[in-house]
Amino acid sequence: MLFHLGKSKKSTLIGSTLVAAVALIAAMIAMPWDLEISQWVRLKHIPGDLRRFIHLMEIFAHTLGCVMILSTLLWIDQRNRSKLWKAAMFVLTCGLLANLAKYLIPRRRPSTYDREPWSWLNPDRDPDSVFVSSWDAWGSPLTESWFNESIRSFPSGHTATAVAMAIGLTYVYPKGKPLFLFMATVAALQRLIAGAHYLSDILVSIPLTLLVALAWA
């Protein structure tokens, strides 16, 4: 198999299926409250150095960052070059699929809202504000401009890429699995803090990437 993340193919399949199912269920639960959750997270005070660290970790999910990381590894680790090429192709595939999906399903990014949502998470909200719902962010499939990035929220391409990087690098360097998963988690959190994606966008990207991994296995 291409990616070996467990003691056997069966355990890998079971574990991946469970993670995908939990992520999908969590996404469905979060979806009605996405805008409220996004605002609550963005209003939370995060110490300066920690916030900078979280934003810097976007490199693990950004196309150019991934190219730099994988190119460096391909250059310095000739022994694992074959595996690294497979990992790179896997990351590329996951990123392309996630971005294709977001171009088919329009959804406004949370950072584009200048009105606060009705929210029990925001006790200091202005009672005279015009409120919007999390459902208002969705558009009709294939009806919006393909070049309007402000409506390309669902799913999170960055998260799909970060999870793919964690899986691909774990395939090449199994001992680094905890570090790779940590980096992917922080990269996904960065998308929420930056207002680029809703929580459900991030969660849905996980089973999407796992599905591709199982197809490659």
Language-model segments: what does each one mean?
Residues 58-73, 158-169:
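Hydrophobic alpha-helical transmembrane segments
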Residues 72-104:
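Interfacial segments of alpha-helical transmembrane regions
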Residues 24-28, 92-100, 184-195:
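Aromatic-anchored segments of alpha-helical transmembrane domains
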Residues 3-20, 125-217:
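Membrane-embedded catalytic cores of phosphoryl/pyrophosphoryl-handling enzymes
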Residues 31-33, 77-78, 105-106, 194-198:
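Short helix-capping/hinge motifs at transmembrane helix termini and TM-loop junctions
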Residues 49, 79-83, 173-179:
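Membrane-helix interface segments
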Residues 20-24, 67, 87, 91-99, ...:
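Alpha-helical transmembrane spans of integral membrane proteins, capturing the lipid-embedded, hydrophobic core
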Residues 1-70, 102-120, 131, 139, ...:
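N-terminal transmembrane-helix/juxtamembrane module of multi-pass inner/ER membrane proteins
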